[in-house]
Amino acid sequence: MFEKPVVKSFQYGNHTVTLETGVMARQATAAVMATMDDTSVFVSVVAKKEAVAGQDFFPLTVNYQERTYAAGKIPGGFFKREGRPSEGETLTARLIDRPIRPLFPSAFKNEVQVIATVVSINPDVNPDMITMIATSAALAISGAPFNGPIGAARVGHIDGELVLNPSNTELENSKLDLVVSGTEGAVLMVESEADNLSEEEMLSAVVYGHDQQQVVIKAINEFAAEVATPSWNWEAPAVNTELKAQVAELAETRLSDAYQITEKMARYEQVGAIKNDTVEALIAQDENLDEREIRGMLGSLEKNVVRSRIIAGNPRIDGREKDMVRALDVRTGVLPRTHGSSLFTRGETQALVTATLGTQRDAQIIDSLMGEKKDNFLLHYNFPPYCVGETGFVGSPKRREIGHGKLAKRGIQAVMPSVDEFPYTVRVVSEITESNGSSSMASVCGTSLALMDAGVPIKASVAGIAMGLVKEGDDFVVLSDILGDEDHLGDMDFKVAGTNAGITALQMDIKIEGITKEIMQIALNQAQGARKHILSVMDEAISGAREDISEFAPRIHTMKISSDKIKDVIGKGGAVIRALCEETGTTIEIEDDGTIKIAATEGAAAKEAIRRIEEITAEVEVGRIYQGKVARLADFGAFVTILPGKDGLVHISQIADKRVEKVSDYLTEGQEVPVKVLEIDRQGRVRLSMKEAVETPAEGEAPAAE
């Protein structure tokens, strides 16, 4: 029934990788089962042989899905099946998409869908690297016009050494978590989080990762040669050179003039008018011309106009030199009732950022295939349509918003205090209110400011900058603080976040081959200068965390009790702690070691909760006088509550100096009486005396029981 499957195994660092095709999903264009030390991913590729008529974009879709059966689990929730992609799945899908997208020919508009399914998981081997490798292999054997294959590597920095594909355990002690992907000759994508590493250390890690993944690229080439899928007979549509010349004659000079308009919306309006005029003029001459073809040529012309001006050394679109940062405006405390806020503006890019402090129960619980963990620092990025002057759908976050939020979080993570240093859950929200390039890096700057405004003791200010590149032949120009147009029309998007001490996050997307180590070094050094300039402006507004948190934020008070007293504070079925929270208006969290965290917006409420917990956990002291409350009467005496949950017996002979016939003649239930602790027997029973408490009034009384 099956043809003999093609299997390729190779050693990749400390891991054994196996690629297999020919058994499953034989109706797909290509399919690969890839395994790295018991972590297995099944990747299918379906590519349409024909493009949809008139389609002017490349419809590539990457879906990444983790199945809970891979970890031997059943999904939670009512329906007991996987639902929409998690944030982690979305980020991995973007990680796969970014290096493969530029390797399809620019004229290729056929629909391509990649579906990656994690089917087995080794908790020590993250599935993202093997998924990227499997995707590369599947595309390499698909026959579609793909200029790969690519490799992928994760690089750690542990004890001063670079480590290839570190395990999750090793990553906990690493100063770097960097993913690099590229072809045999070029780096295409970098995604990283670092703990204040230098530019040289980051570049070394990128080069190391690219060198190591050559093993993968070689193995995939051998795998593809063995599968021997015939290549498609696809050719880029012929360019109508006569029409191209007409378009250039009508629009080139006007577009060059339009790109000297520095204000974005005015420039867009003028460029739009030029394109409409050109289309109308050409169709008036020949009604058979295709408007989409003309607009495609105008887009290419527009790109060439902007790029040639930059390569020639002319001022940029908004009049700046190549290494200039746009004008900055930095404000903090802009919203009266939030715990922390900032408004960061860089040219026509602006972010309104808020910081909110919560308790440990506000932490996000992430239940992934790799296990459950708590996240005490959340950063959410919103990109509403009005920020670019458009209308559009407003709803749940899109892939891009999730990705940008994660990048900003990576930039800030290294300076965040530990939970022991600052026992709060912190949520940051960045609302992009204006956008013209590098809104994710504006979010980094705004987050740093908002956290300081909220009184979060971050280790240092963090700023982010987006760099760009235009390369023609051997000539290239590196641009600082790129605009949206420069990002779209350039060859590289290179985002760097960091402190004055070093880099905390680096993201790189390269659209062309030929980006050398030297070019990346120049870009990193130029980014360092821009970052330090932004940090100096930010430090003028706020250079350190405020001494106190907002009056509207919960204050967390920490106390410690003996672990064997935890059950007393919680009570039967949680009754005691529930009553404490409701009656004092506080939030109380108890850890297994007896640490209690009390969160309250008012100091008096926290003090009352602390007092009551101290009472509950207090030990009864022999010889001490307590103000007790009669709990119940018996023929032989009375049971008196001296501390919450702790009763003692006043024997009938210890009620008064004279003979007592009936206990009820002297006491009633609910009556408050002073009692002295005479002894505590081996069984923990407490013997009390009323008459000795009256006889020795000089001794200090304990707080009344409730």
Curated annotation (Swiss-Prot):
- Domain S1 motif, chain residue ranges per copy: 623-691
Limits of the KH domain? 554-613
InterPro entries, sorted? ExoRNase_PH_dom1 (IPR001247), ExoRNase_PH_dom2 (IPR015847), ExoRNase_PH_dom2_sf (IPR036345), KH_dom (IPR004087), KH_dom_type_1 (IPR004088), KH_dom_type_1_sf (IPR036612), NA-bd_OB-fold (IPR012340), PNPase (IPR012162)
Task: Kindly state which keywords UniProt assigns to this record, in alphabetical order.
Answer: Cytoplasm, Magnesium, Metal-binding, Nucleotidyltransferase, RNA-binding, Transferase
Q: Which residues bind Mg(2+)?
A: D487, D493
Major localisation: cytoplasm
Q: Which SUPFAM superfamilies match?
A: Eukaryotic type KH-domain (KH-domain type I) (SSF54791), Nucleic acid-binding proteins (SSF50249), Polynucleotide phosphorylase/guanosine pentaphosphate synthase (PNPase/GPSI), domain 3 (SSF46915), Ribonuclease PH domain 2-like (SSF55666), Ribosomal protein S5 domain 2-like (SSF54211)
Matches recorded under PROSITE patterns: KH_TYPE_1, S1
Which branch of life, at top level?
Answer: Bacteria
Cellular component, GO annotation: cytosol
Catalytically driven reaction(s): RNA(n+1) + phosphate = RNA(n) + a ribonucleoside 5'-diphosphate
Q: Which SMART domains match?
A: KH, S1
Give the Gene Ontology MF terms in alphabetical order.
3'-5'-RNA exonuclease activity; magnesium ion binding; polyribonucleotide nucleotidyltransferase activity; RNA binding
Identify which cofactors the protein needs according to its UniProt entry.
Answer: Mg(2+)
Q: Where is this protein found? A: Cytoplasm
Question: Any idea what job this protein has?
Answer: Involved in mRNA degradation. Catalyzes the phosphorolysis of single-stranded polyribonucleotides processively in the 3'- to 5'-direction.
The family line of this record is:
Belongs to the polyribonucleotide nucleotidyltransferase family.
- HAMAP family assigned: PNPase (MF_01595)
Q: How does it assemble?
A: Component of the RNA degradosome, which is a multiprotein complex involved in RNA processing and mRNA degradation.
User: What is this protein called in UniProt?
Assistant: Polyribonucleotide nucleotidyltransferase
